[in-house]
Amino acid sequence: MGRAVKVLQLFKTLHRTRQQVFKNDARALEAARIKINEEFKNNKSETSSKKIEELMKIGSDVELLLRTSVIQGIHTDHNTLKLVPRKDLLVENVPYCDAPTQKQ
């Protein structure tokens, strides 16, 4: 797959993730859209393979971070915030056991 195709694929993936993560939040959606477009536009003329790979790594890390770490909060009252987790954020709740397992 060509480098231009990979860059375009990352660009589209970042925008899809932005739409999922900031759903129903017009201000955050717009700010993220502007930032993504700005970063890609600023590095549009980059020709160094090493620098392009580095930027691609940063972009994919940002996408992963957005998808797995950001949670939406909605103000319901004066001092109340309702959290709206996505399925990507929900993990199986396994109890932690610090004691070593005993051999039988």
UniProtKB/Swiss-Prot annotation:
Subunit structure comment from the entry: Interacts with UQCRFS1.
Record organism: Homo sapiens
Pfam family, one: Complex1_LYR
Protein name in the entry: Complex III assembly factor LYRM7
GO biological process terms, semicolon-separated: cellular respiration; mitochondrial respiratory chain complex III assembly
InterPro entries, per database record: Complex1_LYR_dom, Complex1_LYR_LYRM7, MZM1/LYRM7
Subcellular location: Mitochondrion matrix
Annotated family: Belongs to the complex I LYR family.
GO cellular component terms listed in the entry, alphabetical order: mitochondrial matrix; mitochondrial membrane; mitochondrion
Phosphoserine: residues carrying this PTM: S60
Disease tied to this protein: Mitochondrial complex III deficiency, nuclear type 8: A form of mitochondrial complex III deficiency, a disorder of the mitochondrial respiratory chain resulting in a highly variable phenotype depending on which tissues are affected. Clinical features include mitochondrial encephalopathy, psychomotor retardation, ataxia, severe failure to thrive, liver dysfunction, renal tubulopathy, muscle weakness and exercise intolerance.
